[in-house]
Every structure is written in C-alpha cells, then in structure tokens.
Amino acid sequence: MGSLILLFLVWYAMRTLQYMLPVAGHEDLVEIPDSVIRNLAAAALILLLYAVLTAVEKKAGDKIAIWCKRIAVTLGMLWQGIAGLCWVLAADRVPSADQASVIGAAIDFIQGDYGTLAPDHYCGLYAHQLGPAAMEEMLFRILGEADYHVIQIVFVLLNVAGIYCIYGILKEVSGRLAVVAMGTLLAGSCMASVFYTSWVYGEIPWVFCSLFSAWMLVRYIKYGKTGSLVGIVTALTLGTLLRKNTLVLVVAYCMVGAVRIFSKWDRRLLISLVLALALPLLCYQGIYKMYEMRSGMEHSRGLPTSAYLYLGMEEIGGRYGWYYSDCWAQYYATDCNTEQSDQIYREMMQERMQAMKAQPGYLRGFYQGKLLSQWNVPTYQSLYFNFNHGDVYHEKLAALEDRLSGDLFDSVVRMADRLQFIIYLGCLFYFIFCVRKDSEITQQLLAVAVIGGFLFSIFWEAKARYMYAYYMMMFPLAALGYGEIIRLAEKYCFFRKKKI
C-alpha cells in the first residue's frame, strides 16, 4: 500500500504543484504546472551527492566519515536554530485563529473564567482542545505570566532536537555516511519547519514526539534498555495531549509492537503498548474532570466525530472537504446536543455519498482533488498561517522576512516544491526496496504512521497543515530509500570491482 500511495504522490508532485497565497482568511489553493525536468534533475543531483559521499566513505575511512556525519547534523541543527530564532525574534508574530483561542482559554482558566467550556464556546465546541489548553495553562502558571514568545522559542529548540532525532534514527538503522549526512541536511533545509516555529499550536511538538518515538524504538530493539520505552510512552502521551492527531502514531506504534511481540515475546514492549494507549486517554479524562470540578460545569462532548467526517465529504466552491463557515450549523440547530447532531450528520453523510455516487466520475475526482489539496502543497500552509506579524524588533531582518511572503514568495514555493519531490521520490524508493518481509518491523513505525496519515486525510476535514507532520516523518524514510538505491547500484552496477 505504501508504494501505491507514494507512487500517486510522486506522479502528481512531479507534474503539478499547489500553493496558498499568504492572505489572511482566504484558504484558496492555486494549482499550476510543475517542471518535470527540474524535479528529475533535483533528484538526480541528490543521487549524485549520495554516490560521492559513498565513495568518500570508502576512501577516507571510518574516522573521517564519523566527523562528516557530525558536521552534517550540526549544520542542519544550526540552520534550523538560527533561522527559527530569526523568524520568531525579528517581529512579534501574534497568535491567531485556533492557537489564539487555545491561549485565550488558558489565560481565562488562570483568571477563573470558564465561559469557554460552554457547549457553544470554543473549548465546549472543540472538546479535544482542553488538552493543549491545560498544558499551556500549566506552563503560564510556572512562568508567572502568559507569554507565548516562550513557547515559540521552545518550538525552535524542538525543531533542532527533531533534526538530531533524524540523525539518531539514520545512525542506528544505517550508519552510512551518505544516508546520515544527506538525511539530516535535507531535513535541516525544510523551510516549513522554520515558519511553523511561530505557530503556537501542536504541529512542532507532534513532529518532535513522532521522530523521538521512532528513534527510541530503534534504540530499544538494538540495546534493550527500558528507558527507551519510557521515552516512547512519555512522548506519545505528551504528543497526544498537545495534538490529538498523534493518535495516528499511537495506533502505528501498537501495530508494529504487536507484530514484534507475536514474532518474539517481549513483556516490556507489551506493557509499553498498553500504557501508550491508556495514558493519553486517562490524561484527557483527568483534564475533563479537573475542569468540571473547577468550573462547576458539566463537560461538553462538543462536536461529534461525524461532523468532521461529513465536512470531509462536502464540496464548497471547488474546495474538497475544506472548512467552510456554516459547517457546524446542524450542531447549533440542536442547541449544541452532541447525540442529536451526530444523528443528523450521519444522515447527511449517507445522502452526500448517494449524491456523489450518482454522478459518474465525481467520486474519484473529489477524493483525488481532496488528497492533492493536502499533500501536493509543498509549503503545507506554513507561510499562510505565519506571514503576518505585529511589532517589528529588527527592521532589516523583518523586512527580509516580509519579502518571503512578497516578491520572494515564488522562490520559496519553488524551493519547497523541489524538496518535496525529492522526499516523496526517496520515500517511494524506501517502500519499494526497504520494506521487506525479513526487515525489522519496528523500523517501520514512521512508514506505518505515514500510511495511516494518508488514509486519515481521505476521510477527515481537509487541511494541508495537517499533513506537515507526516511530511517530516518521511525525511528519514527518504534518506534510507536513496541510500538503498546507491547500495543496489554499488552491488550490481557502478561500484562493482572488476575481476582480474
């Protein structure tokens, strides 16, 4: 399945691209033709660099190879750190939309105002947002003030740590200079990560927790240390509290862990699977109960799941499954009754599916358009959500950053587009050549999560921002995929020694 998914993404990423102009309040995608030749040339350049680094490793020896790996990961981390700090410190990028609502809820809770918990208010409507609101309230209480700038700095550090996690994964799984160096450098060059440092929401923690969990799982299988499992459970729990989409990774962890246990009994791994499932759910229930006790208000279940599923089936103005202003009208019409609105949304889903089936070719076109509007957007809405700012702290730097959403916007999109194609193609190589019956199943955690994320994006509300985390999970997979291509070439073609 993974090969088919990536073949689909590679085919369209090679020929077209979509972007969203950084204009607040207008989530309108523009689709334009892409350059097949330039995309293929970029991939060929990556393969050439892999070949060069492979030759260097053979001739230079292990000592120099180790230093080259360290230099590569240092460069990747430095770029993400410096670029991220410049992005968040040059100007005041004030939270808006969902992030502002969550921060506002945390501040209200500190002040003893629990109005947001009402069924028709933000945390009552989106009950899952109590997780990040509770975490931010705790942080603000520790700091003594509600300063979102601290969170932005923390996100920069998490980005840097994420690059090191990719380094750790590649070092443990492969160890080859080309794989480790190129994987960390490519991940370090991702501009979407830089732009999302100012987005005070769950995307950056979600990425870090995913990469950290994958690294710890590889280390556990290799070294057998219980601390690695503790790290996984902690990361998955925190990730789920901050961004509930992390549950896709939790399910992936349980799947690969279960397969591993069936083939080789491991009591500690089994316990970690149970805890990874139970702790996030228990923490959420504890948070719900805590706010019930503090506010004296009954916990609102909010929008039913069927509302998001119906939204993912709707088309408004050529936008497939994307949010629109009146999508929650049925919930409000039932006086915010979750059970009654759930029944209404289910009936609407059935009617919508029948209408889609009645139009020949529409169903295929709808879901193709929906998938591409999420996965074929190389910036993943990172500039769209983060281009705006308030006070300027460093005029020259802020002026340069403003140009990224102005006259340099096309260049940013094109660079991100080349990188996206490189990663998608490398990930395709990974699924074709690295996923084998005899491969260690626990090394496939991120691969299973990417497949799960793709399937999730078919049914749920559409948004390119939601795919950013899965894109970052692809970087170590792509690095290993290109490495396997070079290994096969080395074995069968170019680097084979001639017999005398």
Stretch-by-stretch model annotation:
Residues 1-85, 269-277, 493, 500:
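Start-transfer (signal-anchor) and selected internal transmembrane alpha helices
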Residues 29-43, 149-150, 369-447:
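Membrane-interface anchor segments at the N-terminal boundary of transmembrane helices
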Residues 90-107, 111-146, 344-345:
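Extracytoplasmic catalytic/substrate-binding loops of multi-pass membrane glycan-assembly enzymes
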Residues 126, 130, 134, 142-161, ...:
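Loop-to-helix entry region of an early transmembrane alpha helix in multi-pass inner-membrane enzymes
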Residues 153-174, 212, 426-430:
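Transmembrane-helix motifs of polytopic, lipid-linked glycan transferases
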Residues 166-189, 441-444:
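Transmembrane-helix signature of polytopic, membrane-embedded enzymes
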Residues 192-206:
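Short acidic/glycine- and proline-prone juxtamembrane loop motifs at membrane-interface regions
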Residues 289-394:
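Membrane-proximal stem/loop segments at transmembrane-domain junctions that anchor or position
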